[in-house]
Amino acid sequence: TESLMRTAMRSSTRKEWKTLFYLDNFQTPLTKNDAGNYTEPLEMLRLAPSDKNTQPWRVLKSGNCYHFYVTYKSGISREEEIIKRVDAGIALSHFHQTVLELGLKGYFKQTEPGNVGLPKNTNYITSWYTE
């Protein structure tokens, strides 16, 4: 069953963990060890479907907080931007549903961090605070 799901979701062509998840800045990849109890929710986010398998989301862990971003090139059409944001929303849902299933405590809050060396074309969405 897992093999069938991975094929259907094109999981073997998903971006690597180190290109999606970061620790304190966008130059330092987040390790699964650093993610701790949030390894599985982040993995479910990584495996979430996206248009053309682009996986436009990025996550930055800072302290007890996970900041979520969406990436897209400047100059894309409004429709393409909306699709990227919908993809990120679906991925966030995968993250949140896994958090709930695991019984992890936390909450979403709009608090964009400053001074994190935000890469070009990377746009803040929301943050998840762990408890």
Model-derived segments and their meaning:
Residues 1-131:
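Acidic, surface-exposed loops and disordered segments
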